[in-house]
Amino acid sequence: LLGGETAEMPGFYDDGKYDLAGFGVGVADKSDIINGSKIKEGDVLIGLSSTGPHSNGYSLIRKLVTDFEEKITIGGKERKIGEVLLTPTRIYVRPVMDVLSKFRSSVHGMVHVTGGGFYENVPRMFPHAKEGKKQLVAMIKKDSWEVPEIFDELIKRGADPENVFSTFNMGIGFVLAVSKKDAAEILKRFNANAKKFAVKGSPVMKAYEIGYVGHTDKVIKGDFKGSKEMTQFY
C-alpha cells in the first residue's frame, strides 16, 4: 500500500462487524504525472459538480437525519431524504481524461474534494513554497456554482453554516488548476461533452470557473490539512 486510512465511521458498524474494501495501483511515466509542481499564481480553478455529499460527511448526516423515509422537496419533486442521500458518487475519470487528451500541458493540478471539504483537500495539490518564496493558495469565489439543495437541507437541520466547507464538498467534487490562456476552452470542453459521459439516473455534470490561484505571505509549515490560509473564500 502506498497510503491509506482506517475509516472508523462511528455509529455505523455493529460490534463484531467490519468493512472489506479494495484498491487499485496505477503505473505512469514520471513525465506524465500531474503533481502540482507547475501550478502558478494566476492559474484558473475549475470545479466539477458533485451529485451530493458523495461518500463523505455521513457520520454528521446520520446525526442530522433521524428518519430516512421522510419526504423532502428536491428539484421540485418530493423524494425520500434517504434516497437523495444515496445518490451515487460521481466518477470523474472519463471527462477528466478527455480534457487531458487535448490540454494535458495546461492542466497543472487536480484534486478530489472528499472528507474535509475544501479546506482539507484543495491545498493538497499545492507545492510547499521554498524559503523566501510566496506560498500559493486557492482563492474561491463562493457564489460561482450551484450548490445542490441537499446541502441547504442539511444546514436547516443543524449543520453549522460556518463549517460546511470543511465537512462537505458543497457541490464541487473535483478541482483543477489550469493555465489562464486555455481555461475558457477547457471549461467549454467539459460542459460540451458532459452529456456524453453522463451516467443514467444521475444529474449531468457541470463545470464552473470557481476561482484562481493566489498567494499568501504567511509561512505555512508542515501539513496544509485544514489550513484556512490555504483556501480562502471571497
Regions found by a protein language model. Name each.
Residues L2-Y58, Y212:
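Glycine-rich anion-binding loops of enzyme active sites
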Residues N35, T51, T66, R124-M125:
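N-terminal low-complexity, intrinsically disordered patches enriched in charged
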Residues E41-E83:
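Acidic, glycine-rich loop-and-beta core segments that form the ion-binding/anion-interacting portion
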Residues V25, L60, I186-R189:
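Short alpha-helical scaffold segments that flank and stabilize functional sites
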Residues Y13-Y18, K71-L86, R90-Y234:
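Glycine-/charge-enriched secondary-structure boundary and capping motifs
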